[in-house]
Amino acid sequence: MKTLLRAATALCVLLATESRAQEAVRVPAAGKPDMAANASFRSFIDALRPDAEARGVSAATFDAAFRGVSSPDPGILARTTAQGEFGRPVWEYLVGAVSTGRIAKGRSQAARLSGTLSAIEARTGVPRWIVLAFWAVESDFGASGGTVPTIRALATLAQARFRGALFRNELLDALTILQRGDIAPEAMKGSWAGAMGQTQFLPSTFLKHAVDFDGDGHRDIWRSEADALASIAGYLQTLGWNRDLSWGYAVTLPGGFDLTRYRADLSDFTKRGVRRIDGEALPASGAASLFLPGGSGGPVFLITDNFEVIRAYNTSDSYALAVGHLADRLAGGPALAAPWPTGAARLDKAGLQALQKGLAARDLYTGDADGRAGPKLREAVRRYQIKEGLVADGYATPALLEHLTARP
C-alpha cells in the first residue's frame, strides 16, 4: 500500500508543480497558422502510431482519435503554472472549496444518491461524505468535468515533452481507453492537463482504478455518477484508506500545550487535553499528528494516515484540508471557530525557497527548493523551531526566515 501511495503521490507532484517545459509550443503570431509547428505536430502523431499499435490500439481507433487534431493547442502550455491551491493561502482556498452553497448542494446530492452511496460505502469502506467531498472539489458534483478534448491536450503536452515522457505515456493510455470502448473520442474531455471527467483521473489512473459500477459495460467517469463515485472510492481504498479512522479532527488545545510532542497516538492526545471541536471523543487509538496550517493562533487539526491518502489524489495541503473539512461539514459537523491569520505577512515563493535552502544547509530539509509548503518543509520547520526554542507549530513565516538568516 505504501508503495502505491508513494507512486500516486509522485504522479500528482508532476502535475501540480510549476512548469519546467523542455520545449515550448510555438504560438502562431497574430492568429496565423504556424505551418512548421503544425507539420512537426503531425510528424509526432505519425511517430506515435507504432507504439500505440504495440499496445493493441487498432489503426481505426488511432485514426478516429486524431481525426481533426492537426495542430497543437497554443493555449495549453501557457496554463502550466502552479495550481491555485498552491498559490493561495489555505483560508482563501477554503472559502470557495467549503462554501455554504457547496455544503447545501452536497447534502442534497447525498439524499438523492443515498442508495448508490450506501452500496459504495459497503464495498470500499470509504465514507460517503469523503467521496462526495472529492466529487465536489474535483468537478462540482459532476457539473464541471472539463471541456478540453483530452487527446489534443495530451498530444500538445507530449509533443512539447512537458514533464519528459509523462504525457506521451498518458496519451498512449488514453488511446487504450478508446480502444476498450469506454468512451468515444469526441466525448473524452477534461482539463488542459488531461485529467478527465467527474473524477479528474489521468488516463493511467483510469486504466487502473476506474469502475463500472452501474453495470452497463463501460467505465464511464464522464456521464455516470455511479461509476464516478465508485471510482473515487475504489481508488482511495486501493491507496490504503483506513475505514476505522477519519481523515483528521478539528481540535482545540489546552493552555500551555507542548507542541514539541506533535506526533503521538490519539489516546495520548486525549490524555493531554486535546478535544474535538464538535464535542465528540477522539478514537481510543490510532497514529496522528498535529497540523496547524495557519500557525499556533489559527485552527488546529489532528491528522491521520488518511490525510496522506487524500494527498495522494492531489499533493496540496490546502486541497487535502478542503476535502476533509468539506466532508465533515456535509456530515453535519461545525464550521471552524479559530480565526485564520488573514492579516499576517506571508512568505512568497522566493521566501519559501530561501527558507528551504537555509534549512537544507542545516541538514533539516531534504526536499527540493521549489518554494512550496508541504509535509517536508513543515517537518523541517518544526525541527528548527524545537532546536531554537521557538513555538513548534511548523508554520513558515517571514519572522522565521529572518530568525534563520540571522544565525548563519
What are the language-model segments listed below?
Residues K2-A10:
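Sec-dependent signal peptide recognition
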Residues T17-A21:
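Sec/Tat signal peptide C-region and signal peptidase I cleavage site
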Residues A24, L77, S144-P149, M188-K189:
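Short, solvent-exposed loop/turn and secondary-structure capping segments
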Residues G31-S70, A78-Q83, A158-G194, Q198-K357, ...:
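Extracytoplasmic and endomembrane cell-envelope/extracellular-matrix remodeling and assembly machinery
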Residues R42-T61, G101-A136, T147, T156-F167:
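Export/targeting segments at the very N-terminus of extracytoplasmic proteins
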Residues A60-G87, W135-S139, P149-R152, A250-G255, ...:
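Acidic helix-start/capping segments at beta-turn-to-alpha-helix junctions
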Residues L347-L352, K357-L404:
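Short acidic, glycine/serine/threonine-rich helix-capping segments at coil-helix boundaries
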